[in-house]
């Protein structure tokens, strides 16, 4: 394998940038997720403001066998998402916040199966705009998994970590 050595200035710059990313990446990820959940949650308090509200309301109504009407479902979902957003902003109760997030994501994916004619033009390869909106949530789930890996004090390291195993 050929490796080329970078000039000294480039290596120093690369190390500084990598160090900055390691120091701030998790915080920025947490805040970015918080913005998404808070913003989308607040939209659900205003009828017609969220492009996903009709599908979300029908999904919850279907999952609860009609016990929770669509308008009530949207208010519950709005509070739920705002709570997740605030928890992420404040970096408080992260285990509970991430649990709420994962449960919400399970609910978010169900329209792909409950309403495939609305979420795909050709099932399962060509999603509609609503389907794409749902499928992109894999990025949110992956981000939450990364944050979850830090609830016990884990962190990012800008340098390789060599694990030593007891012999």
Feature locations, PLM:
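Membrane-interface extramembranous regions
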Residues: 1-167
